[in-house]
Structures are given as structure tokens and as C-alpha cells.
Amino acid sequence: NFNAMVAAIDALGGLDIPLSYAEMVFMNDYCIETSQETGKSYTPVELPDPKPENEEEILGTYHLNGVQSVSYCRIRYTASMDMGRTERQRRVIGMMVDKAKAAGITTIFNIMDEVFPMISTSITKTEILNLIPTLMGYNIADTTGFPAKYKFADVKKASMVVADTLEDNVKELHKFLYGADENYQPSQNIV
């Protein structure tokens, strides 16, 4: 269900996202299904003609509505595969946070009124609304994908991302969260 994400992005006035030719092609394809599922409209991004030699190179920044932005998040078939998809998802979430903070608390409250009925959570709407003023002071310093070291494996006719070794990935995650620590060793439960 993409309705809440589409509604939130539309309420923020859309997002300005850098796109490659490959992303445009796949995003336009995903827009058809995303539009059908949400009942929201979109305009396909016009593809440059001729097609660029390097389809992965960023061609420019495009203003995308909710359907387009969610479809952009769904792309997994570019050269960066599933790791690129999760990177796009993190990018969109970061842009939404920045745009919401710039819009102010009133806009955020209005978005909450619109999207809260579309989500499922154990936190009440009042609890979330009470957190918003505090959250306005936070910044997303950096994001990363996990696992950091991985391989692809076929499991029951599906391709999956599998951690190379859990121990190495736990060390990478610890380093990302807490900084370099030469003495850190994962617990025996991980090893």
C-alpha cells in the first residue's frame, strides 16, 4: 500500500530528484502500477532522444509527484540492483524529512491528519504529534545499506541479498553507528 507515501509527498509539493536515463525508464514503468494502486495520476517523465550512451549517468533533476517518487523508490533493475533501490528509498525519505522540516510544524500536522488513517502503528496519533517538535531539531547525518558485505543467492527461485558473514557485517554496522573501535568484537551469538 503506497497511499500514505504518495499522499505525504504530494502534500509536500513533490520532490526534486536527480535521474538517470535508466531510472526514468523503470520509474515510468512502475508509475503505471503505482498509479493504479493509489488512484493518483502522474505524467511520465519524457525520455531524452537519442538515448544516452551511459544510461546510468545522471541527466538532470526532475520535479516528481508522489506517484513518481514512490515509483522511483521501487526501481531495482538498474546496474546498482537492490542496493540501488534501498539507496533511492533512503534518499527520498531524507528529502521528505528536509522538505517537511522546512515547511514547518503546521504542514507536518496537516500531513499527519491526512496520512495517519492510512498507516498501522502501535504509537497513537497524539504520541506522534507530541514528538514532532522534538524531531524538528534532529538531522539525518548519514545513511547506509546493510549488509555492507553481501552476495546474491537464489532461494526458492528468488534472488536474495545475503550477508557474506554476519560477523563482518556486524563490525561494519558498529563502525557506522559508533565510529572506529579497534577493540570491538561481536558477541559469540553473532560469531
Question: What do these predicted regions represent?
Answer:
Residues 1-20, 76, 95-103, 114-122, ...:
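Structured segments of extracytoplasmic/periplasmic soluble domains
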Residues 2, 55-58, 78, 113, ...:
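Sparse, context-dependent recognition of short Cys/His-centered cofactor- or disulfide-binding micro-motifs
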Residues 6-107:
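Flexible, polar/acidic helix-loop-strand segments at domain edges
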Residues 64, 106-109, 113-191:
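C-terminal solvent-exposed extensions
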